[in-house]
């Protein structure tokens, strides 16, 4: 599995600000979107382009355009919605697919409860977004759903990832690509990432 930890100074700075315990909902939400945008920039660096001719201000001019690669952004409810706007800033024509998976706090197992995928997802590259890759259960369950629907090109974008989650994802889906702003220390006894960001969903939606 291709694993990319994005170490750009802007990414590290913004993620560092997100780790502050008393950060406001507004600021956390803004930063989640901004880091999501920067991760998208890196994750889409291998998109193919083609040369086309358009009419410029002084006559015909050749330009580079992305070569017909359709994209669907797949936020995992609910926290993934916090990164979606930043992703769409870079790929505004992308369609949106939504998957709902929550983690049972006792068993730590993923429980799928909702999915609404674009009809031609088999023709699209999926950018799956979720702030945290902890145990990997929710992400694996989401990718299971996408592959069952025919999606063959999948990239995962997360703000922070635990080594345990990375290992589980690689074992389940070695063909996907992972882009993260940080590979953190690991999980505590409750399955939360250390140092992590706390509960990203609560911080994005202000439901502490």
From Swiss-Prot:
InterPro entries associated with the record: PRibTrfase_dom (IPR000836), PRTase-like (IPR029057), Upp_B (IPR034332), UPRTase/APRTase (IPR050054), Ura_phspho_trans (IPR005765)
GO biological process: UMP salvage; uracil salvage
GO cellular component, one term: cytosol
Keywords: Allosteric enzyme, Glycosyltransferase, GTP-binding, Magnesium, Nucleotide-binding, Transferase
CDD domains in alphabetical order: PRTases_typeI (cd06223)
Enzyme class at the top of the EC tree: transferase
Molecular function (Gene Ontology), one example: uracil phosphoribosyltransferase activity
Pathway where this protein functions: Pyrimidine metabolism; UMP biosynthesis via salvage pathway; UMP from uracil: step 1/1
EC number annotated for this UniProt entry: 2.4.2.9
Cofactor note as given: Binds 1 Mg(2+) ion per subunit. The magnesium is bound as Mg-PRPP.
Catalytic activity line of the entry: UMP + diphosphate = 5-phospho-alpha-D-ribose 1-diphosphate + uracil
SUPFAM superfamilies: PRTase-like
Regulation of its activity: Allosterically activated by GTP.
Function: Catalyzes the conversion of uracil and 5-phospho-alpha-D-ribose 1-diphosphate (PRPP) to UMP and diphosphate.
Family designation: Belongs to the UPRTase family.
Protein name: Uracil phosphoribosyltransferase
The organism of origin for this protein: Yersinia pestis
């Amino acid at each position: 599995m291709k694993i990319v930890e994005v170490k750009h100074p802007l990414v590290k700075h913004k993620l560092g600000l997100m780790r502050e315990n008393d950060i406001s909902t507004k600021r956390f939400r803004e930063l989640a979107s901004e880091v999501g945008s920067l991760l998208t920039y890196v994750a889409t660096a291998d998109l193919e382009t083609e040369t086309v001719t358009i009419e410029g201000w002084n006559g015909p001019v050749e330009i580079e355009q992305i070569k017909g690669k359709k994209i669907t952004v797949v936020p995992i409810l609910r926290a993934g919605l916090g990164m979606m706007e930043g992703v769409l800033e870079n790929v505004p024509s992308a369609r949106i697919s939504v998957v709902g998976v929550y983690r049972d706090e006792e068993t730590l197992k993923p429980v799928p409860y909702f999915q609404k995928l674009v009809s031609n997802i088999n023709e699209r590259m999926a950018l799956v977004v979720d702030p945290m890759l902890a145990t990997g259960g929710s992400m694996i369950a989401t990718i299971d759903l996408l592959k069952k629907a025919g999606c063959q090109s999948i990239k995962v974008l997360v703000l922070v990832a635990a080594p345990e989650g990375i290992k589980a994802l690689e074992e389940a889906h070695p063909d996907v690509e992972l882009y993260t702003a940080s590979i953190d220390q690991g999980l505590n006894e409750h399955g939360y990432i250390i140092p992590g960001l706390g509960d990203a969903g609560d911080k994005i939606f202000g439901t502490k």
